């Protein structure tokens, strides 16, 4: 957990853009309900959560961590969180679907009064599976790849006021966006876009869609 705090602080130091969401961040944080951030793989759910909490005192648990999962003990984990993050106001549970029976544990934390932000992309996080345990306790926040305005913003161009000298660049970005989409990683590394998208496509179809619908033959 201490190493995860160091990773959290490193991620918070990197440059990002503010994402567009249905609800303003300050309104979300004021709500005592569970903030559930879902969406496809690699669209920036964790980054959005970190940015939303950047100016607050928050604790962080990343369940995309085999060591944490292999040695998981709820009581020890919570005590360690309180030791590492003194008097934290929010608790961010990243990729929490990797924890067996995560929904029951999250509900328990909610009942204890923790203000929770959780992220997940696996098929197990989809609304149908959550309906029984979390009903009435969470606010859904759907994340998607960058929109075209967000893509333009990444290049330090205000999409609402494009200078004449930047218009050719924006047209080029629009063409690339139509061909490649708006996944954050390919915006940063266009040269590797096709290979990255191919791998991502396989992951989403073979791991998420096939698993959710119990498709055995994916040929």
Model-derived regions: residue spans:
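Conserved lysine of the Walker
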Residues: 45-46
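Short glycine-rich substrate-engagement loop in P-loop NTPases that contacts/grips substrate
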Residues: 59-90
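Structural recognition of the conserved hydrophobic beta-strand(s) that form the central parallel beta-sheet
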Residues: 92, 115-121, 142, 151
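Hydrophobic anchor at the beta1->P-loop junction of P-loop NTPases
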Residues: 37
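A short, basic N-terminal segment
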Residues: 1-28
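Interdomain hinge/linker elements that couple catalytic modules in large macromolecular machines
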Residues: 1-9, 149-219
């Amino acid at each position: 957990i201490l190493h995860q705090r160091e990773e959290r602080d490193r991620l918070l130091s990197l440059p990002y853009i503010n994402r567009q969401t249905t609800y303003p961040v300050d309104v979300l944080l004021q709500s005592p309900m569970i903030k559930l951030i879902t969406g496809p793989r690699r669209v920036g759910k964790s980054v959005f959560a970190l940015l939303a909490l950047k100016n607050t005192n928050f604790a962080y648990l990343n369940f995309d961590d085999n060591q944490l999962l292999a040695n998981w003990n709820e009581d020890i984990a919570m005590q360690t969180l309180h030791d590492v993050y003194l008097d934290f106001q929010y608790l961010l549970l990243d990729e929490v679907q990797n924890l067996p029976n995560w929904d029951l544990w999250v509900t328990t934390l909610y009942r204890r009064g923790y203000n929770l932000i959780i992220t997940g992309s696996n098929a197990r996080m989809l609304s149908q599976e959550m309906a029984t345990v979390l009903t009435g306790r969470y606010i859904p926040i759907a994340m998607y790849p960058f929109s075209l305005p967000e893509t333009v913003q990444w290049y330090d161009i205000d999409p609402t006021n494009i200078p004449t000298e930047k218009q050719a660049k924006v047209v080029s970005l629009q063409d690339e966006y139509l061909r490649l989409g708006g996944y954050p990683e390919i915006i940063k590394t266009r040269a590797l876009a096709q290979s990255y998208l191919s791998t991502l496509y396989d992951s989403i179809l073979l791991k998420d869609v096939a698993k959710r619908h119990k498709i055995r033959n994916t040929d």
